[in-house]
Curated annotation (Swiss-Prot):
It catalyses: tRNA(Arg) + L-arginine + ATP = L-arginyl-tRNA(Arg) + AMP + diphosphate. Monomer. Belongs to the class-I aminoacyl-tRNA synthetase family. The gene is argS. One of its GO terms (biological process) is arginyl-tRNA aminoacylation. Keywords: Aminoacyl-tRNA synthetase, ATP-binding, Cytoplasm, Ligase, Nucleotide-binding, Protein biosynthesis. This is Arginine--tRNA ligase. GO terms for molecular function: arginine-tRNA ligase activity; ATP binding. HAMAP family: Arg_tRNA_synth. NCBIfam families: argS. It comes from the Bacteria. PROSITE patterns: AA_TRNA_LIGASE_I (PS00178). It comes from Halothermothrix orenii (strain H 168 / OCM 544 / DSM 9562). Its EC number is 6.1.1.19. It is found in: Cytoplasm.
Amino acid sequence: MIDFKEKLVDLISQEINDLNVEEIEHLIEIPPQPEMGDYALPCFKFAGIFKKAPNIIAEEIASKIEGNSYFSKVVNTGPYVNFFINKEIFAETVLEEILQKGKYYGARNIGKGKNVIVEFSSPNIAKPFHIGHIRTTVIGHALRNIYNFLGYNAIAINHLGDYGTQFGKLIVALNKWGDKDKIKSNPIPEFLKLYIKFHEEAEKNPELEEKARSWFNRLENKDEEAMDLWKWIRNMSLKEFKRVYDMLGIDFDSYAGESFYSDMMPDVIEEMEEKGLLQESQGAKIVDLEEYNMPPAMIEKSDGSTLYITRDIAAAIYRKKTYNFYKNIYVVGSQQKLHFDQWFKIIELMGHEWARDCIHVPFGMVSLEDGTMSTRKGRVVFLEDVLNKAIEKTKETIEDKNPDLENKEEVAKIVGIGAVIFQELYNSRIKDYVFSWDRTLSFEGETGPYVQYTYVRTKSVLNKSNYKFKKLDDYSLLTDEDAFNVIKLISQFPDTIIKASERYEPSIITRHITELAKAFNKYYHDNQILVDDQKVREARLFLVYAVNTVLKTGLSLLGIKTPEKM
């Protein structure tokens, strides 16, 4: 595909020798209004070079470049040179690339097979898989898809919270109040009841906390009874989690959680000792990070048990040895920023240069309309309940609007779950938000169902046409303003994917395909597609095909399926 910006940089650099290509590229802007052109060059910086007023320089540059085949019009407006793309060449370039690449339009082999680890979701064993987990789960899954699409080998790791003092608490609760048959039929809610009961009883009887610590130490020492109970709790939980992952269409390359790294702790602590990083503090081992404006990081408690941070360090070292990663990405809430800052710095101080390749991708907090979620108090919204409610609500809408639709159950699942994922990926990941049933399940505005419906509309037109796509004889039929706006958004899709990968921000893609859906629906409203004139019909169908391709790819990258009918 012709890169019009690159062509523009070449043209400008022929006229201005004092700046290099990169400097010129950084100067080029996109005008705020379409009527001002497709690109703009501000000439303020050239005043010192040419010893002339910027508006005179702009006028001279415009007169020299005018008449180029790639740009139909070049004009100066005050100190700016505005460039208007040749719409016919532009349409031909973009649409023929779509024809050539199909569903791989936008894919590039930037990664050349390099390994990128994306750690995401990572729920705690025996605790609810709640609405708060949706963000890490869908952001991580989208990033994995994006990196694979760009030629990396993305490895999805679910770093399960399957280790720690909470297992001591749960084992105590299980032994005192648990009913294994009840747990088997409904694991997570039953584990939650036990967890809540433990905390309620421990407030009255502090000895329970001591018993919990004792059980966790037995677990760390590989005591057979403790290990058997732990494995049973883990397996029951994982079975539940996988059911939700299946609903979301997500799988993982590894479920290696915290426990996987427990045997590696002594070597990690020994390496820190050898590097002179550890200090004693009240019987515990810490790394002093005051020099880096951070509080000390505790590596080992006074009773000899390890912490989350120790296991994260061990996991990173293991991953580097095993996968030789290019990037090691952690999709974890923004409240964990200090934790990651600390252990990234410790890895660096241990002499591992690859510490800079470990990246924390933070996201904002989710809270309920009446306050923050708390597992200890049992105030949670289960993610599975949210997904099922979304499916049910979608089914009601289908029954109301299209009762004769085939495969209603399947369509309701695709659209309902897609609505939840789309909602999570529409706004910038760093923003906190309050979870609202009404907003999440709304089927109006900038939503997943709107984009999915636009895709179905394009699919329906294409099915009716039976048209076999080939190069057009006349691309001037797609140079009107509405068609040009659609084609421009299609042309920006490949760079949108790259931008999303560089910023670890799937919402860039979500918003882009929403804008494409809007632009296409305006075009569709004003232009009949299946007209009698064969050439016009073929041109418009080609545009429909291009939109169909990009919407399907965009939704797929976000982890959202596309129904064939709605």
